[in-house]
């Protein structure tokens, strides 16, 4: 199964693509969709949708795993939620089934406990995908963790 993991954001949307055929998980691709801070929010949403469409067309995921937004007080909360909405809409347009996970569930699935530190989750991602070097940037590594959670929780 090919799974696209998404770590939503406005400035950077992390993505990770894994393949689970043959009983092993392997990373196919990871990176970020970057938007320019000088652009309007609307233009940034267009960039996210456009780049995500390209990823979906290139990798043809059978499942998307998206991190659920964890609400807290921040000046960027609304923008991040809107960017996540663009991600969800784009996935729906391509009829990609979606599963969603809050950060605590991702940490639990990867590191064994919901309050794991970021480096513990990263180590688990590297172990599960048999990587010698950590995926970069952090948003891409987070997206791979989301994709793996999608596989483990199916």
Curated annotation (Swiss-Prot):
The keyword Cytoplasm applies. It catalyses: Endonucleolytic cleavage at a junction such as a reciprocal single-stranded crossover between two homologous DNA duplexes (Holliday junction). Mg(2+) 1 binds at residues 7, 139. GO terms for cellular component: cytoplasm; Holliday junction resolvase complex. GO terms for molecular function: crossover junction DNA endonuclease activity; DNA binding; magnesium ion binding. HAMAP family: RuvC. This is Crossover junction endodeoxyribonuclease RuvC. The lineage of its organism: Bacteria, Bacillati, Cyanobacteriota, Cyanophyceae, Synechococcales.
